[in-house]
Swiss-Prot record:
HAMAP family: PyrH_B (MF_01220_B). This is Uridylate kinase. The keyword Kinase applies. Homohexamer. It catalyses: UMP + ATP = UDP + ADP. NCBIfam families: pyrH_bact. It comes from Baumannia cicadellinicola subsp. Homalodisca coagulata. CDD domains: AAK_UMPK-PyrH-Ec.
Length: 249
């Protein structure tokens, strides 16, 4: 049986920590190369790929905020950290012949282009990976919110939230060995159980616009491919309008 992807256009949300690998700070080239290779496997299936990357591997605004630096300034610094990560991802992609472009929410002439929706759609339709940098360009909004916003703007079928855990659990599995890994959840379940997956702004944006989110472990080799091919992987978050997934097992 020929395996076909269940999504044709995705928004991949990578945390900055995903690029850390086993390090405590910065970019682990082994982790970066592995993630990019997995993305390349999807390109073979002509899947349109947009990426939003966090900056937590380089900068944590909450730490400086406690030292008295203004929140707005901290958020601006965080935006620049996402640009650094975006440059690293694109450069790695170009080395293995993946055509990719960076569109930044803030002007950075000479470094990357300014975000423009028409430009983004045009690139995606040409099977060029689009990396969305600098969040949404405004303070007080997380990169998770940016991922949901960009996902909606480009008409993504799903937001794939790549994390360091296998999906959404009923409790912290590091603390509670009996924690249950959920296969699928609707947004109301998440709010009712106060599960910490994304900030409320991001979740509300996705919920109100019927945008499904799948949470999975990017550190598991092949997990990204399995998610896109409809294999049982991670946790799907959906609204009642979205049918639950029938897996290609």
């Amino acid at each position: 049986m020929t395996i076909k992807p269940i999504y044709q256009r995705i928004l991949l949300k990578l945390s900055g920590e995903a690029l850390q690998g086993k390090n405590n700070f910065g970019i682990d080239t082994n982790a970066l190369n592995r993630i990019v290779q997995e993305i390349k496997e999807l390109i073979k299936f002509k899947i349109n790929i947009g990426i939003v990357i966090g900056g937590g591997n380089l900068f944590r605004g909450t730490l400086l905020a406690h030292l008295g630096i203004q929140r707005v300034v901290c958020d601006h610094m965080g935006m620049l950290a996402t640009v650094i990560n975006s440059l690293a991802i694109r450069n790695t992609m170009l080395h293995i012949n993946i055509n990719a472009n960076i569109l930044s929410a803030i002007p950075l002439d000479g470094i990357c282009e300014l975000y423009n929706l028409d430009k983004a759609i045009d690139l995606l339709e040409k099977n060029i990976v689009v990396i969305f940098a600098a969040g949404i360009g405004n303070p007080f909004f997380t990169t998770d919110s940016a991922a949901c916003l960009r996902g909606l703007e480009i008409g993504a079928d799903v937001v794939l939230k790549a994390t360091k855990v296998d999906g959404v659990f009923s409790a912290d599995p590091k603390i509670d060995p009996d924690a249950i890994l959920y296969d699928q959840l609707n947004y109301k379940d998440i709010l009712k159980q106060e599960l910490k997956i994304m900030d409320l702004t991001a979740l509300t944006l996705a919920h109100d616009n019927h945008l499904p989110i799948r949470v999975f472990n990017i550190n598991k080799p092949g997990a990204l491919w399995r998610v896109v091919m409809g294999k049982k992987e991670g946790t799907l978050i959906y609204t009642p309008k979205i049918n639950k997934v029938n897996y290609n097992i």
